Amino acid sequence: MLARSSQTLLAPTPAYSPAIPAADWATAAATPSLTKSGALQAEEIATYLASAPGRAILVDNTSDISLARQYPTFLKKGISVVTPNKKGFSDDLSLWKDIFASAAEGKALVYHESTVGAGLPVLSTLKDLVATGDEVTRIEGVFSGTLSFLFNTFAPASGSSDAQWSAVVAQAKELGYTEPDPRDDLNGMDVARKLTILARIAGLEVTSPDSFPIESLIPAELASLPSSADGITQFMTRLPEFDAQMANVKDTAEQQGKVVRYVGSIDVAAKAVKVGLQYFDKDSAIAGLKGSDNIISFYTKRYGANPL
């Protein structure tokens, strides 16, 4: 199957035979019996994939919530899903339940390890802890490489930095650490989505990522600027007006012998999830991160005071 917004090219079904050679796609695209006008709907794609001679896998490399909401459609037909798209697993709790119920119904698999921690085995480790009977009491960490870079540069644990907050944000944007619109990092929602996924695996029924406190680093006066190229330029131009606010946060931490970091935490016993700024001793693991490194700690009954 080869698709674009105006046309979809399909190999014959149900046997997918004869297959269309890759080099002949242009010729095949001119054959009415092999094409369909416009893009296929999720149900049509699922039906097509389900007719494959072997097991089919949907690999979703988008961050599209509308596609993620269609995962149950594929899973019920026995089509496994592999994706880094965290939106489907951090959206409304009903979708989370529907995804895994549909996977069980269709005897399909769901792999979303890279929704948290990129390539690190974060979710599989947490699932193994839960599956082997350990009791997770708390999860804490720095979950955003972008925000890690910002605070490690702005308020390093060793040495000092005179850099203004807006200059560090501009540097991160220039280096490609931030999204095209840095507000997509500074609003904390990406971290909140990751915390939602972890909390659900740990056993908490978090309804959605906006159901718990999220501390945004976007000045209120700039939050309503449009997401257009002009709006992004306005945001970056005006951000220096608010450098004093972040300098005060850094100075307050320094007066206590600490540094400020942007972290997420889950208190399983208290059923509390939060995302925002916290102060840490300079010799702590979180304070000692370098560059854009992340750190995630699992506190469990089995591991006691020493987190995994």
Give the label of every model feature segment.
Residues M1-K77:
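N-terminal glycine-/serine-/threonine-rich beta1-alpha1-beta2 phosphate-ribose binding loop
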Residues A11-S17, Y71, L93-W96, P121-K127, ...:
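Short acidic, glycine/serine/threonine-rich loops at helix termini
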Residues D64-K77, K86-S114, A118-L129:
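Rossmann-fold NAD(P)-binding glycine/threonine-rich loop
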Residues V81-V82, L109-V110, E179:
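Hydrophobic beta-strand scaffold residues
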Residues E105-K107, Y111-L175, D185-V191, I197:
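Rossmann-like NAD(P)H-binding beta-loop-alpha module
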Residues Y303-L308:
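C-terminal catalytic subdomain
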